[in-house]
Amino acid sequence: MGVPTPARRARLTFGALLAVPTLLLGGCTVSPPPAPQSTETTETTPPPPPKAPTQIIMAIDSIGPGFNPHLLSDQSPVNAAIASLVLPSSFRPVPDPTSPTGSRWELDTTLLESAEVTNENPFTVTYKIRPEAQWTDNAPIAADDYWYLWRQMVSQPGVVDPAGYDLITGVQSVEGGKQAVVTFSQPYPAWRELFNDILPAHIVKDIPGGFGAGLARAMPVTGGQFRVETIDPQRDEILLARNDRFWSVPAKPDLVLFRRGGAPAALADSIRNGDTQVAQVHGGAATFAQLSAIPDVRTARIVTPRVMQLTLRAQQPKLADPQVRKAILGLIDVDLLASVGAGDDNTVTLAQAQVRSPSDPGYVPTAPPAMTRDDALELLRDAGYVSEPVPPPDNTADDPPPDNGRERIVKDGVPLTIVLGVASNDPTSVAVANTAADQLRNVGIDASVLALDPVALYGDALVNNRVDAVVGWRQAGGDLATVLASRYGCRALEATPVATAVPGPATTTSQAPTTTTTTTPPATTTPTPTAPIPAPESGELVQAPSNITGICDRSIQPRIDAALDGTDDIADVIQAVEPRLWNMATVLPILQDTTIVAAGPSVQNVSLTGAVPVGIVGDAGDWTKTK
C-alpha cells in the first residue's frame, strides 16, 4: 500500500472530522418510548377525603360559674369534669367503697415517675415529674407549678379546704425543675390529695384576675389529654379537643363537646336520635323515667362533689350568743332550701351531718330534731329580743295603709338584721339565699341578700364584716380530717403569717430544705376578728382564714389535730365532735347536689359509677364512638 499524497490526506482528515459529530449525536439520542398497548385513557384516583373528627357530645345544664377547681365559688359538676380532663394531677381518684370517702387516690404515671415520702423528720414528700410533661404552650410542667399552687391555696381566701396546704413549709425545685421537694410541719397522711388539678403558674399569675378570677371564663393553657378549644357562655358550650402535645397515651375521641341539653323532652329526642351520646343533668323522676325508657340507654343517679351550706359568722356581735344562732337556724326550713337548691322536680339529697357528706360510705344523719317556730322564737326572747308591730311607712295619702299584722324582732329598740352573702356568679346559691331571707323576714327578722363577686365575698366582705352569713357550695369527696380542720379548726380562724423553709422555688440545689413550723393562733371559743390579708405583692406568705364561722371549740381541737396527723382514727373523731359542732350552731348543711347521668348505645367505655370527685368523665379519654 502506498503512502497517501498530501491531497488524499486532507480528504481523509476532513471525512474523519465529519464522522465524529455524527457518532456523538447518535450516542446521545434517547430511545423512543414503546408503543402504547391500549388506546384507553387512564384516570387518576383522587385521594380519599380526610376522616371526619370523632366528636362525642355530652349534655349538661350549664357550664357553671367558673373553671378554677380550687375555688369554693367555682364548684360545679362541669368544672370538676373539665379539670379532670385538661389539668395534670399527681394522683387520680378511683372508686373504693372501703375508704372513708369512697375514693382511693392512685399515682398518675402520665405526670409523675414517682411520688413518695422521703423523710419523716421533717415530713417530706418528693415528686419526680416526667421529663416530657409539658403544657400546651410547650412550657414544661415543673416544680414551679407546685410552688405556685401551694402559695395560692395558703394565701387566697375562698379556697377549697386548705388545711393540708397550710401544713407545708416549703416547696423546693431540683433537677432542673423536674423534682418538687415538699416539706411539712408535721406528718400528713392525706398528702396524696394535694397538688391535683395543677394550674399553669406562668400563665395564671399574669392573666387579669389571677388565681381568684382569671379562670372565670377561660382556660388558656392546659396539660392533660384534652385542651380547651372554645368556651361559649352564651350557648353554654365547651369544646375540648385532643391535646396533640400530650406526651402519653392520646385520648381516643378527637373532640368532646359539653352543651346545654335543654328541656327533658328535647334531651330525650337528642339521645334517641343519636345526636347526644352522654348526659349529666339535673332532673326528677319524670326525666329519669323518660331517659330510661329509650332502648339501649343506660341511666343512673349520682351525687356530685359539692354540698351546699349556710354558715353563720359568730364573730358578729349580734350572733355571738349561741342561742340566737340556734334560733335563726331553727327558723329556716331546710327541706324548702334543699328543694330550691336541687332545682325543679329534681331529686333532693339532704345533707344532715357537719363533716361527712351523703356520698361518704360512713355517712349517717347527725342533725338534731328540727326546732319548731315557737321554740325558736322563745330562744330569741330568752336572749332579750321582743316582737313589736312594724311601724307604718310615712304616707301622705288620705287612706292609711292596711294593717297586715307584720311584726319585727328587736332588742333595745334595734331590729335584728341578717345580711346573707352569696357569690353573684352562682344563681343556685342566690336563689337559696333569697329563700332563706324570705323565711326570716316572715318571722320579723330584717334579712337581706348581698350578692358579691366571689373575690370580694370571701375577701373584703368577710374581713370588713359586711355579711353575717354565707350561702354557698363546699367540696365533697375529700379527706375528712382535712375538711374538719379547714372548716372548724382553731388554726384556720385568723390570717396568720407562715414561716417558710425557702422564700421561693430554687433550681440549682438538690438539698432538701430545712423546715420551720407555722405560727398558729391560740385555740379559742370566743369570736375572733378577721385580720386583713396583706397584699400579694408584699411577698409575705399569710395563711388566709378558711374557718369562716369566726369561732372554734378548743375542747375538740386536740382531736382535730390528731385526726389531721393520723394519730387518731377519723371515724372516732367524727363521732366525738359532731354533737359539739351542731351545738355551736354555725353551719347548716342543706343538700348534696344530685344529677342524672345517661349513656347512649353509640358510645362505649362510659362508666356511670365514677369516683365522686370526677364523676363519669374520669375515663373520657377512653370513650369510643361506635357509629
UniProtKB/Swiss-Prot annotation:
Top-level lineage group: Bacteria
Biased composition regions of type Low complexity, renumbered to the chain: 501-528
Molecular functions (GO terms): peptide transmembrane transporter activity
Keywords: Lipid biosynthesis, Lipid metabolism, Phospholipid biosynthesis, Phospholipid metabolism, Signal, Virulence
Disordered: annotated span: 29-52, 385-407, 501-540
Full protein name: Probable monoacyl phosphatidylinositol tetramannoside-binding protein LpqW
Disulfide linkage: none
One GO cellular component term: membrane
Signal peptide stretch: 1-27
Metabolic or biological pathway, per its Swiss-Prot or TrEMBL entry: Phospholipid metabolism; phosphatidylinositol metabolism
GO biological process per UniProt: glycolipid biosynthetic process; peptide transport; phosphatidylinositol metabolic process; phospholipid biosynthetic process
Source organism of this protein record: Mycolicibacterium smegmatis (strain ATCC 700084 / mc(2)155) (Mycobacterium smegmatis)
Purpose: May directly or indirectly regulate the accessibility of the key branch point intermediate, monoacyl phosphatidylinositol tetramannoside (AcPIM4), to the elongating alpha-1,6 mannosyltransferases which could regulate the lipoarabinomannans (LAMs) biosynthesis.
Family stated for the protein in its record: Belongs to the bacterial solute-binding protein 5 family.
Coiled coil stretches, renumbered: none
